[in-house]
Amino acid sequence: MKVIKTLSIINFFIFVTFNIKNESKYSNTFINNAYNMSIRRSMAESNPSTGAGGSGSAGGSGSAGGSGSAGGSGSAGGSGSAGSGDGNGANPGADAERSPSTPATTTTTTTTNDAEASTSTSSENPNHNNAETNPKGKGEVQKPNQANKETQNNSNVQQDSQTKSNVPPTQDADTKSPTAQPEQAENSAPIAEQTESPELQSAPENKGTGQHGHMHGSRNNHPQNTSDSQKECTDGNKENCGAAPSLLSNSSNIASINKFVVLISATLVLSFAIFI
């Protein structure tokens, strides 16, 4: 009797440890799943959807102040500039000699009380345009025009040469293109042969399927049922495809539950046998 009690005690501890391991496995998976779900929810709450609030410049800084000369003080001075040495013509010395004899400009301004309207008249020197009085200046002014005409002629010649050089390659490409068409036709012939070859290869497969069709009545033809189920899965019947894995998962869960119940019942029986 003592030996039986000792063995029962040993078995009791073994079953208890085994049950604890199984429970720890299931509890760990459950806890991990719950923890992962809580982390995902917290991440979703901490990262809200960023709206479209862009920092835009609301203040439009515009020049609203219109500074206008509203003063009524007008300048009536008639200061005229005598002929400067740096003239527009080619002979600045002639400008300097002619300028003292005639004044350049004389301005007269009349101002009203409100200074809103002002009229000015100016008399210019008729001899101010030195390019017209100086024949030498005309010759020097015309030289740049001749240079521009020469450059334009050169550019026109270059454009003509470019257009001539661009024309022949297009004609050559057009003349060569008909020769490439027979080569493409020759290349298309082996492609047609390749397309015919798969039909010949598919013929024995059709024969094999016909033979399998005659063998459905035999008893030893169980693997074909699995192939039929696979065909249904490939056809798109999701119900048939999901049936097998769902049954397997349920059976595994049921087996684990049965083992757990058996171990608990065994430990209870041994505990009663030991202490009673």
Curated annotation (Swiss-Prot):
Keyword Glycoprotein: yes
Any Pfam family: MSA_2
Cystines in this chain: C233-C241
Annotated stretches, region: 5 X 6 AA tandem repeats of G-G-S-G-S-A: 53-82
Sorted UniProt keywords: Cell membrane, Disulfide bond, Glycoprotein, GPI-anchor, Lipoprotein, Malaria, Membrane, Merozoite, Repeat, Signal
Ranges annotated as biased composition (Polar residues): 143-169, 176-187, 194-204
Protein name: Merozoite surface protein 2
Glycosylated residue positions: N22, N36, N153, N225, N250
Domain notes: The N-terminal region appears to be involved in lipid binding.
Basic and acidic residues bias (residue ranges): 229-238
Signal peptide boundaries: 1-20
Localization (cell): Cell membrane
Sequence repeats (start-end): 53-58, 59-64, 65-70, 71-76, 77-82
Biological source species: Plasmodium falciparum (isolate 7G8)
Function recorded in the entry: May play a role in the merozoite attachment to the erythrocyte.
